């Protein structure tokens, strides 16, 4: 995890103050081309995917990329390739890397009280990428200065609770030229706020969510007495920044937006990952019993996942029945229905027909396709499995699990 934090800090602003925004120009691409930025990001992602904290969950990744993709389409660079991914870490943080790679901690997703709040953070990170902030930070320096940036990140990590100590460590690492970097990065956060807010509005989300989320984090940091959320250490939020965002929001038309069901389901699924199955069962039973907070559909969804994990199959099927009646068409719930069938919680002699119909309804839902492929392999329908997996690999060329399933299928065929 230490290595992962170093990578994150290398590509996020170090300090921030609410200042005016001079025209920084487009000097960044004179130093690092978009192709080089992508290469740097790819190399970093290679290390991140190998880290145990990388959350390899297709449903959560697909949700983040669907949400992030809708935001990118309303950015200044809608054609740029982006990849959004989750880090299994309770710390409230998100970070952008060059080339369009954006990581979000599970703690931040669970802390977001609405989809608009999560979208506001993603919009902010998208702005860091589209504005080429990393390239601006090292403009005028040699390309190999990235090595010293890693040392700077290490200094910040070791003194993250003491900004003054961090500044002293940074200057000790690279006295010449670092002050100019800091002067530029002081502007990046406010620029990302302004541009991110525009992305949020164009994408149809509640713009009030941005100042609301930042203000809540700031208040929580005061209550924690020094145990500042990680997001505030890598993206310092000042009263001036919050006031500036709030002032901009007040000039925009009010547009309340309900959170999607998928947002609620993802949060429920993350709760099951943060707890033991028994703890999750107690948690969701309590939530459903009080019926005061959260989405009851999502709470029941989380309960069924926990029951399935604990092999309480009969009760899992019992709890799933009303869920299926409440929601007629949803990829995540259809995937859970398939998992209950595969586990034997729901007896279905026509299980392949169920998966065929579900796959037709949700052809891009990778988790569903994983299970459908397994069913086809179990039924020795190898040609059907090959056809399905070849199409999925074409649609998702960076998914190693699909390649694994494809290789298993070809191995059986000889």
PLM feature spans:
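Catalytic Zn2+-binding segment of zinc metalloproteases
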Residues: 116, 126-143, 161
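Acidic/histidine metal-binding catalytic segments
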Residues: 60, 80, 138-147, 164-169, ...
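Extracytoplasmic and endomembrane cell-envelope/extracellular-matrix remodeling and assembly machinery
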Residues: 24-31, 42, 54, 62, ...
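Short pre-active-site segment immediately N-terminal to the catalytic Zn-binding motif
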Residues: 106-120
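Membrane-active amphipathic alpha-helices enriched in small hydrophobic residues
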Residues: 146-164, 168-180
